[in-house]
């Protein structure tokens, strides 16, 4: 797989402290599901976050954040964050924003 293993290790350190999180390979990378809903992931050197439309609009004001678009059609409420915008405690802040949105979604059972 072609995604940042260093970023993945850092994500695992954080999400492993959350309940009901499982990894799943998708989008050519890896995603983490919280209660069956994608909360975050990695594609190449980008952190993928599911923030909801309001928080995503705020995140898109950051110069190192862009719409999540791997098909030619952006996914509303999702963003791609450059790995270098995840340094230090920034990664945990990004992940907590996604968690805050996803933990209010209905649980998905597969």
Positions of the model-derived regions?
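Charge-dense, helix-prone N-terminal extensions
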Residues: 1-110
């Amino acid at each position: 797989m072609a995604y940042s293993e260093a970023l993945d290790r850092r994500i695992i350190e954080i999400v492993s402290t959350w309940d009901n999180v499982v990894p799943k390979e998708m989008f050519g990378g890896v995603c983490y599901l919280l209660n069956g809903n994608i909360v975050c992931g990695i594609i190449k050197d980008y952190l993928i976050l599911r923030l909801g439309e309001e928080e995503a609009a705020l995140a898109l004001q950051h110069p190192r954040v862009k719409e999540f678009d791997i098909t030619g059609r952006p996914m509303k409420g999702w963003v791609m964050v450059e790995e270098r915008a995840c340094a230090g405690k920034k990664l945990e802040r990004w992940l907590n924003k996604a968690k805050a949105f996803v933990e209010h979604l209905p649980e998905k059972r597969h």
